[in-house]
Amino acid sequence: MKLLTNANTLKGTIRVPGDKSISHRAIIFGSISQGVTRIVDVLRGEDVLSTIEAFKQMGVLIEDDGEIITIYGKGFAGLTQPNNLLDMGNSGTSMRLIAGVLAGQEFEVTMVGDNSLSKRPMDRIALPLSKMGARISGVTNRDLPPLKLQGTKKLKPIFYHLPVASAQVKSALIFAALQTKGESLIVEKEQTRNHTEDMIRQFGGHLDIKDKEIRLNGGQSLVGQDIRVPGDISSAAFWIVAGLIIPNSHIILENVGINETRTGILDVVSKMGGKIKLSSVDNQVKSATLTVDYSHLQATHISGAMIPRLIDELPIIALLATQAQGTTVIADAQELKVKETDRIQVVVESLKQMGADITATADGMIIRGNTPLHAASLDCHGDHRIGMMIAIAALLVKEGEVDLSGEEAINTSYPNFLEHLEGLVNA
């Protein structure tokens, strides 16, 4: 498709879709709790739909009237063996988190995914879940999907130091630990998004958190809840960057999630000199309205504990850095290599094709700004965040056309992204 180019200004108000991470977890907790859970503002992207379909196949009644998703929870003990393979599509979150649930079930399941998911490492969950007593391995390759998983009702507690900073691995172990008899201890390498921990408490469970240590007991009773999902800051990030780099822009983003483990992009943007203001803060839901204005930006350095707080935003931050004065360094971000694509390689190649001065490193990128971008023909590579990054980059192109292939990947997390983009350009 031909993307919008040469934007003079962006103006408007957007309500971004519900947070993908929270939507997945709300569906899972609703299914493994007793009683009814009602969820408002769920993201209805392809990844979350994979999670919904998986629990339907395991006997959970889930209704969607277009506004509210209602889940009639069955508890861990009420899940039943699916008749077919569990197809997780492109969703690594679905596969890893649901593997933690399945570890405590006595039936055998095979989980499959698309070509992209079939290249993503699963040994990071297979190893600790095997230590707990589940049998899990790749069908054709030990470390990659499809995964065959045989759970057990005799799952053992675990004491485990996470070798990578991964909220998905942590969450898989938490779901497994809830099905043990005894106390588990999970120690993070760096603090990652804590939606699973927050939601356990919302559903009536208990855990103890001290620094990077999480302790929890198995056998807890979880009870259905009413949940409102805030907007996804990872989706809002594209509009934040667009507003900062297109002259005279003024964008208002309503109901954006501001969980402290996810707001790294706000800290980085402020450090770079970006004009971004928070208002209408809701401390219960952890959401706020963000107002973004065009800004003159300075380069920065992003590494260490900051990386897990903005790992999904790094592609669009790389674009932001092409428009900042000076050299931006992104380091300690090797996790980007095992996302939907090798995001280090694909971001660097895509932006280079558009004229950016950007270099890949073993664990990140070096970006020298500021540089004008030019027309090119590009591909999403099956990665929603790459597609949206390119669409924002195209707005800076003054002459010629930007062609994007595989734009359907954007539906993974933001089905009406291109419609919202058109609204901002034509306001």
From Swiss-Prot:
- Top enzyme category: transferase
Which pathway or pathways does this protein act in? Metabolic intermediate biosynthesis; chorismate biosynthesis; chorismate from D-erythrose 4-phosphate and phosphoenolpyruvate: step 6/7
| Keyword Mitochondrion tagged | no
Tell me which residues this entry annotates as catalytic: D312 (proton acceptor)
Q: For this UniProt record, give its keywords in alphabetical order, as a comma-separated list.
A: Amino-acid biosynthesis, Aromatic amino acid biosynthesis, Cytoplasm, Transferase
The residues that the entry says bind 3-phosphoshikimate are K20, S21, R25, S166, Q168, D312, K339
Catalyses which reaction? 3-phosphoshikimate + phosphoenolpyruvate = 5-O-(1-carboxyvinyl)-3-phosphoshikimate + phosphate
Q: What is its EC number?
A: 2.5.1.19
Q: Which SUPFAM superfamilies match?
A: EPT/RTPC-like
Q: Which domain of life is it from?
A: Bacteria
Alphabetical list of HAMAP family matching this protein: EPSP_synth
Q: Which PROSITE patterns match?
A: EPSP_SYNTHASE_1, EPSP_SYNTHASE_2
Where, in this chain's numbering, is phosphoenolpyruvate bound?
K20, G92, R120, Q168, R343, R385
Q: What does this protein do?
A: Catalyzes the transfer of the enolpyruvyl moiety of phosphoenolpyruvate (PEP) to the 5-hydroxyl of shikimate-3-phosphate (S3P) to produce enolpyruvyl shikimate-3-phosphate and inorganic phosphate.
| GO MF terms held by the record | 3-phosphoshikimate 1-carboxyvinyltransferase activity
What is its subcellular localisation? Answer: Cytoplasm
Protein name per Swiss-Prot or TrEMBL:
3-phosphoshikimate 1-carboxyvinyltransferase
